[in-house]
Amino acid sequence: MSSSITDEKISGEQQQPAGRKLYYNTSTFAEPPLVDGEGNPINYEPEVYNPDHEKLYHNPSLPAQSIQDTRDDELLERVYSQDQGVEYEEDEEDKPNLSAASIKSYALTRFTSLLHIHEFSWENVNPIPELRKMTWQNWNYFFMGYFAWLSAAWAFFCVSVSVAPLAELYDRPTKDITWGLGLVLFVRSAGAVIFGLWTDKSSRKWPYITCLFLFVIAQLCTPWCDTYEKFLGVRWITGIAMGGIYGCASATAIEDAPVKARSFLSGLFFSAYAMGFIFAIIFYRAFGYFRDDGWKILFWFSIFLPILLIFWRLLWPETKYFTKVLKARKLILSDAVKANGGEPLPKANFKQKMVSMKRTVQKYWLLFAYLVVLLVGPNYLTHASQDLLPTMLRAQLGLSKDAVTVIVVVTNIGAICGGMIFGQFMEVTGRRLGLLIACTMGGCFTYPAFMLRSEKAILGAGFMLYFCVFGVWGILPIHLAELAPADARALVAGLSYQLGNLASAAASTIETQLADRYPLERDASGAVIKEDYAKVMAILTGSVFIFTFACVFVGHEKFHRDLSSPVMKKYINQVEEYEADGLSISDIVEQKTECASVKMIDSNVSKTYEEHIETV
């Protein structure tokens, strides 16, 4: 085992005197201490705590507030993020056990496991104290991400509110125009994979800018598409951008924020989707006052926000957290090379990556299958209840443009409130019970929202319906992250979400086709001229609420599972310590490389990068 250049705290019988740094190693040679730019050895003194965890000494090179914030975050990851100290270290329950006894025990505990109400604490539920800790830079990055997701939703719902003029322009039935909505959802998975890999590996900034540039192109070109085929091609670009923007926008918005504030900020961030719908319907109505083709101006006007965001993002560097991640990766790689006897690590080829992915799927196939099925329901909920709402209000109920605008705005305000309130409410109920409550309430409001067919009923019941739909989404992201296994969280959680989204891509097209089976009026030739969209939306939305309820009930949860990566946390702490001492990470890596070039007597067996990570 190679020695470590990084600072080591000595526990047990060995004690380190204050003001001294003790280097030790387990190999056959000693490594030199780290030095600063002038060649002077660094005398780094770590923080020391007594058994009661009272701080006896802190590094004077770090500001007091910074030290306290770091300590708070570490305690939060270990204590606040654990419910009564429950940890899931081995994750044995992620591996399927299909014995009869295991299945029986699991089935009998589906109801009783819901009865545990977690301890109520205003400190856990009230986000205001933590929001006050947000700096202006934190808010700057948050709104940069928030408005990027809003612009994506705005671009998507521009088609939803313009179905009627688009159908007239291309002389196509409504179901063909709604296929443009479905196409966006179909190709979102491709965008998520392409830009997700780029975002995780290299940058948050440039994928963000690229996706926004694609939105500008798509929104600018859509009104100029003179054929239906060109229209679909342009919406295909929108789908790629929409799939890619979510990951980099959410990371930009959340990852630098205080840890305790992230739950509330996550719910607020997702509400940008509903706000995008509000922007689309308001400006559609506003431009419709002046011109019959006001929908074209809506598309062109919507590009101002992504253009503004592109210039805004160009002015700011990568987030602080991601900058530390990039530096930590350099340290991880240098330590892995050192552990490999100084030899460069071989890169895994495509076949080896596929074999690794196959092993992961074989290990977690049951959990993965459950998560895919679970995600189908909420994705259908969103699109089945929202995408055709303006069409139903205009074409079936014959409401005025002003009434349609008011209803869409009010119901989406309900969606915004639901996401934030349920996001905090689940801290008391837990994930599953919170989801079941949202599904039950939503099912109760489905019939009056769609079937009473009056403006007042839609305003009241519709507000509560979308309150519950987005209440589901206020809980689901963290529930999904907690269920996914630690060693395959990105693969299992990300792929299951995208497959669930893919399954729901045709929701609006299915609704328009089913509406033809429930005609309200026919012309002299027997052709349907007025469809019952409300009945179809009520049937599909109610069915999906029941489906989602069943999936959540038979599932399980890992409330407040620790989502942090111990390896990355360790190396990020090293980055912070080195930079606090005025060291360059590049210099640290160079020194590690020089030390790794020294031949060790016991270096006959080389380590892989994965084995090094396991050792850490």
Swiss-Prot record:
Principal subcellular localization: membrane
Q: Where is the composition biased (Basic and acidic residues)?
A: 1-11
One GO molecular-function entry: carboxylic acid transmembrane transporter activity
Q: N-acetylserine is carried by which residues?
A: S2
Cellular compartments per GO CC: cell periphery; fungal-type vacuole; mitochondrion; plasma membrane
Task: Region Disordered: list its residue ranges.
Answer: 1-65
**Localization terms from the record:** Membrane
Give residue ranges on the Extracellular side: 162-176, 227-230, 285-296, 385-402, 454-457, 511-535
The organism encoding this protein is Saccharomyces cerevisiae (strain ATCC 204508 / S288c)
Q: What is this protein called?
A: Carboxylic acid transporter protein homolog
Pfam families in the cross-refs: Sugar_tr
